[in-house]
Amino acid sequence: MERITVTLGERSYPITIAAGLFSDPTSFWPLKAGEQAMLVTNQTLAPLYLDTLCARLEGAGVIVDRVILPDGEQYKTLAVMDQVFSALLAKPHGRDTTLIALGGGVIGDLTGFAAASYQRGVRFIQVPTTLLSQVDSSVGGKTAVNHPLGKNMIGAFYQPAAVVVDLDCLDTLPARELSSGLAEVIKYGIILDGDFFSWLEKNLDALLALDGTAMSRCIRRCCELKAEVVAADEHEHGLRALLNLGHTYGHAIEAHMGYGNWLHGEAVAAGMVMAARTAERLGQFNPQDTDRIISLLQRAGLPVKGPESMTAEEYLPHMMRDKKVLAGEMRLVLPLEIGRAELRRGVAHDIVLASIRDCQ
């Protein structure tokens, strides 16, 4: 069992990583016997895990209710989140309840925002079931829903009480979702840890085969890096923005193509190549390193080009609605070398457009 702490003073919390955690109710600390909880999941995961997890928690004396939401990025909306509020109020659940987010990034983000909003804030626990959510979205307290004009535009910073990563969940993960998660894994190597990137180049086949030892090490390192960044810059005033490598371009793809048509990791993968090409055009990134990024993404089964049906000009309106835009000026996360990146402002739009065209 691996345990990492996200250090935020009184709001610090553990990330527990191991196989078989669903069989151990103590993994869900700080939940205790006699307390009330609402377990939020989706229609795909409910048949796989819901009854087992509820039975374990109820066996430990926790009073568990449940709400099952539709599955997909297109359902990460205020309207769907209202189903969680309705379920909480119907019982009813008070301020001492705990929301449990059992799912990937959509369930985690939506449930976290519901927890931040319900009766002005209740406790919640992240139980990520996809690789992407285990290494990224479940850690750090970013909660949100989408708007038709932009991804994650309505939300709050609200930290979980705990993150429970059961490695057994990856056994039921579709191959496309596994690849999507690997995009975020590769991102950490590009922006923060060149040695980790090299390790990924050597061990990617083991990760694709769901080798337990390799996967545990991979998830642990990603969570360590994310925890360090969040502890240093919880509200994304500087360092944490680097975690958005590829996201400004990628969110444009997701919004333009319709949420759910491109998985988040797929859009980020293409976006990271666009960011590398932008950095190349600015003379700050070695084309050979771009080739390493492209090679690793392709081996992971990820796209390295944007949608054929989307012109470069169609990216810009979405990119100008990005949350990193300040005073009407786009800010982009760009790599400097494998293992190091910067937040760059003032990049000319013609350079951005040319870099996108490089990836069409």
UniProtKB/Swiss-Prot annotation:
Q: Which reaction does it catalyse?
A: 7-phospho-2-dehydro-3-deoxy-D-arabino-heptonate = 3-dehydroquinate + phosphate
State its cofactor: Co(2+); Zn(2+); NAD(+)
So where does Zn(2+) get bound?
E184, H247, H264
The record's annotation in Pfam families points to:
DHQ_synthase, DHQS_C
Which Gene Ontology molecular function entries are recorded, alphabetically? 3-dehydroquinate synthase activity; metal ion binding; nucleotide binding
Where does the UniProt entry say this protein principally localizes? cytoplasm
The EC code for this enzyme is: 4.2.3.4
Q: In which pathway does it act?
A: Metabolic intermediate biosynthesis; chorismate biosynthesis; chorismate from D-erythrose 4-phosphate and phosphoenolpyruvate: step 2/7
Q: Which residues of the sequence carry a binding annotation for NAD(+)?
A: 71-76, 105-109, 129-130, 142, 151, 169-172
Q: Where in the cell is it found?
A: Cytoplasm
One of this protein's GO BP terms?
amino acid biosynthetic process
Sorted UniProt keywords: Amino-acid biosynthesis, Aromatic amino acid biosynthesis, Cobalt, Cytoplasm, Lyase, Metal-binding, NAD, Nucleotide-binding, Zinc
The record's section on InterPro entries has: Dehydroquinate_synthase, DHQ_synth_AroB, DHQ_synth_fam, DHQS/DOIS_N, DHQS_C
Role, per record: Catalyzes the conversion of 3-deoxy-D-arabino-heptulosonate 7-phosphate (DAHP) to dehydroquinate (DHQ).
Which family is this protein grouped under? Belongs to the sugar phosphate cyclases superfamily. Dehydroquinate synthase family.
Name listed for the protein in its UniProt record: 3-dehydroquinate synthase
Q: Which organism is it from?
A: Erwinia tasmaniensis (strain DSM 17950 / CFBP 7177 / CIP 109463 / NCPPB 4357 / Et1/99)
